[in-house]
Each structure stands twice: as C-alpha cells, then as structure tokens.
Amino acid sequence: MRQGFVKVAAVTPKIVVADTRENTKLICEEIRKAEESGAKIIVLPELAITGYTCSDLFLQEKMLREAKQSLLEIAAFTFALDCIVFVGLPLEYNGKLYNVAAALNNGKVLGFVPKTYLPNYNEFYEARHFTRGMDEVVIVRLDKDLTAPMGKKLLFVCDTMPELKIGVELCEDLWTPEPPAIRHALNGANVIVNLSASDETTGKDIYRRELVKGQSARLLCGYVYASAGDGESTQDVVYSAHNMIAENGRLLAQSERFQNESIFSEIDILKLNAERRRMTTFEMAEDGYREISFSLKIEETKLTRYIDPMPFVPGSKADRDRRCEEILMIQAMGLKKRLEHTHCKSAVIGISGGLDSTLALLVTVKAFDILGMDHKNIKAVTMPGFGTTDRTYDNAVSMIRCLGADFMEVSIKDAVNIHFRDIGQDPKVHDVTYENGQARERTQILMDIANKSGGMVIGTGDLSELALGWATYNGDHMSMYAVNASVPKTLVRHLVQFYADTCGDGKLEKVLLDVLDTPVSPELLPPEDGKIAQKTEDLVGPYELHDFYLYHMLRLGYSPAKIYRLAKIAFAGSYDDATILKWLKTFYRRFFTQQFKRSCLPDGPKVGSVAVSPRGDLRMPSDASSRIWMEELENLQ
C-alpha cells in the first residue's frame, strides 16, 4: 500500500446453490488464498453465500437464518487476515428482504449496502423477492450484542490510509442511467466494488466490459467487478464469472469467462486522487454519507500491473498509426490557422537533418497542402556550422528537394567567427559561448529571412527538450510558431517513421529512415573523423527515460521515489538502478532550473495530455526551489 498502490482481487468460488454451509467453506478458502496473494480488497459475487439462483428459496426462513450464520462465520474468519472483504447475501430487516453486500474486516461486520436497482425484466425477477435499498442508514441487529449499519450511503474508509475510500454497488446498479457509484464517487469514494451475478448471452461481455471501463473513467476511480459463475443453477441461464479490475478507463485485469478465475491487480489510489485534483469540474458533494473505518497494514505492495516504459507511445501498431495521423493533423491545423491569421506568404524552417527539424518540415508541408499553397513558399534553410557532418547535411538537402521546398543554404561559419572576434571569444575554446553563439546566429538568419520574405519562422524544438531546457535561450528556443512544442522525443521518432511508411515516395522514405538512424545531436561541436561527436543522450541522458519521468511527474504528480520505483520495473533489463537514478536526478535538476526558458515559449499546438506552455498546462515560477524533490532523490538507493 506504500505510494498509493492497493492490491485488489475479484474472486468467484464454485458455490453450491442453497448450501450455505458448503459455500461458507468455499468462500473462506478463496478469501484465504487471495489474502495470501497480497490482496487487501477482496470482492466476491452477489448473493455468494446462498447462490444468486435460489429463486423462491430466498423466502424460506431457514435459508435466511443460515445465510446470516454463514456471514458471521466468514466475518470471524477474517479476524487474523489483513484485508477487507465484500460478500453478498440476502438479509432480512423489518419484515423486508434486501439483496446486500456485507463488508468484513478484522473479524467484524462493518456494514451492509443494499442493492438500489432490482431488475424485473426478461430473465430477471428480483423484485419478486427483494426490496429496493433505503436511502437512510439503519441499524441491523445480527445477534444479541451485534449490530451493523445498513444503507446506500455508506463508504468504507481505511484509517491507516485515509486516501482509500470504498463505495459499493451491486450488478444492475451499474447498468442504469444513474448508478449509485456516481454519488459514491462525488462523496469521496475512489474505489467502487461491484458484487454481480450477470448471466451470459452472446455479445454481453463486450458491453459489460465497456460499462466497467467507462464507469471507472467517468468517475476517476478504481472498479472491482466480481460476478457469479460455475456453480450457479443453469436452469434457464448460464453465469460466466466475468471478473474485471479497471482504473480510470484502463482494464488492469480480466478473467477468462467460464473459468471461475480469481484475478488480481493493484489500483493506484494516489494517481486517482491526483486526477481528481486536476479536474476541477469533478465537484465533491456532501450527501450525508456515513463513513465506516477499517484497518489495513501499510506494507510494500509487489506490483504485477504492467508499467509502460513508453507512456506517450501506443503499444499496438494500429493504435500508434492512428495516433500519429491524428497528431500530424493537429500540428498542421494549428499552423494552418496561424498562417491564415497572419497572412504570411511563406514559412521559414532551419533544417539540420535531425529528427525535430524533419518533423517540423513534414508538418509544414501538410499545412501547405491543406491551404493549397505551393511548397516553394516553404523556405527550408540549411546552415552548416562547425559541427555539421556530411550525413546530416546530405539528408537535409535530399529531404528538402524530395518535398519540393525552396532550398536555401547559408553557412554560419564566417558570421560566427566575426562575432567571436567582436566579443573576444577564442574559437578554440569549445564552451557554452561557442555552442550558443552558433544557435543564436542560426535563429537570427531565420528571423531575417522571414522578415525578408513576409514569412513565419517555424519552431522545431520538442517537448522533451523543453522539459530539460535543452535549447539555447533566444536561439533555437525562439520562433514564431512552435509546431513540436508538445510532442515528446519518443513520439517524434514514431511520427517520422509513420510519415516514411505512408508517404509513397521511395526516395523520401529512404532519407527519413536514415534520419531516424542518426544519433540525436545539436552538432555544435566539431565532428570526429567526420562523424557526430556531440551526442545529446550521452550528455543529458536517454530520452526514453526522461519522457517516462516527465509523464509521471507532470501528468500524474508522482514523487521522485514513486517514479524511481516504477522506472526500475519498466526498464528492468535495459538500465540498471544506478543509471535510472542518475538521470532522474538530472531530470529534476534541469526541470526546475530551466523553467525560465519555458516561461516565454512561443505559441504552439497542444497535442497530448502533457504540455509545458506557460499559457496552458504549466504555470510554474521560474525561481521555484527544487530542494524537497532533490532531498528525496538523495535518500534513494
């Protein structure tokens, strides 16, 4: 449970219809196995103690008495276990019968949540036996000295982890226009458990899965769905034990249907709370809910859920291609509008032969195509300097010609040498002045060409560079419209790859593939034996690590310790722990110290959920202290 991870289980025992004593044994055994597997929240199906398909046997006093006795035995069984259990049973109160979920912890019955919506259509006729749950909280007497609250407005709150609040709904409740989980969530519940007995018909599993995913997304919550399965009566229908665990729209685990399979995963409570803090329209309510405390030990939770090392990049090729097509269109449409608004006659781009300028050129070409403008109005400028290699130069020239842009070449060597002479910079001293002088000279050239041609300078820098401040202030940092400003480096590669795969031009494809194969470099230092000597990832670290850090820090608000923990899992076998920690420290240090560059970024389109525009997603003071983050990093090993 440390760092917000809570292991949950959805469990379907093979019950015997109406045999409460046998079911008690089966349920206790499943609870034991789930708890030994580390589950802290264990959810069993609707009416699991008796079986959902008892039908008119629910009206038998003997059945109800035995069900209550079974509940007390199961509750006692939890005394030595570190978990909270939710199990279904029929419960009589004031002469009425209710279909309820019982919450059990530390040997006690914490409370009962009755089902709100009773299906009474098609194969369902629950209203024949049960009464709709009451709004007010009442007290149910279970034994001479034992009582427990019952009502729809109950939430179960962990006293050792107050961030964890659990709400309950039962089967049909999920399928209605206004599920109880909505009010639960608005009153603080961030985990919803659903005790279900959903029969199987053709195609129903697809709809059910979308309901669970959609509910968890809409309510920014974890959702644990446990359904009845083999063991229920098949007199008229079949139950498939379709169990699911979802978190904010993502399916974390799902059982094979017809297998009575227990499933496990970890729900990230702190992530859900961070999402709710961010979404200010998720307005909390006060509907008179009663919160009931339970206790769990705070222990390290072994993570079994998949940790994606590339959070910005979809895993499947089909999804990746759709994402790339969409992003290219967003970028192009953003630029199209800016060109129309400013009545610019041309676009000016510095082309280095690297990934970022390549993507910016491709986006500009797409925008011009949308506008019906001639590619010759794209002034693609290559500006060889002291670090330019033949490979990047040749790729830049070939690419420009393949795309039909107006090729321009302006060497910066003479101008930079004159500038160095004017300011007293020794050209043999390859320091920050040596590097930044070249970057600023290139920006000056582009700005002047734009003025001369009535054009607009298109920025090429990407999100990853901006996060690290890997840009020369008022050099490549500056433009008139920055099309790549919210595209992370790991995604830039896939966008260029997608364009290469779909352009239909063999020569252009070959050039783009070689650009992809070229080391990332600003080429501001002289080459060695004609090859790139200055490799960005050797200096600031691998971009795949930095993009991982950026996503989890900025998008989810995770602490350094939590990011480090997840990165070790995500990049196991690729980077050792020391390397991950080294570059994580670099990331935090640079992220804070370089905010002044992000505070004056030019306009550019947002394409994803993470961006650093000072007018949009990141409003951060340039002089904020990084002390508390760096101290946490220093304590990590």
Predicted regions and their residues:
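Enzyme catalytic cores with a strong preference for nitrogen-chemistry domains
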Residues: M1-G350, K366-K376
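ATP/NTP-dependent adenylation/nucleotidyl-transfer catalytic domains that generate, transfer
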Residues: K7, N23, T160-L164, C221, ...
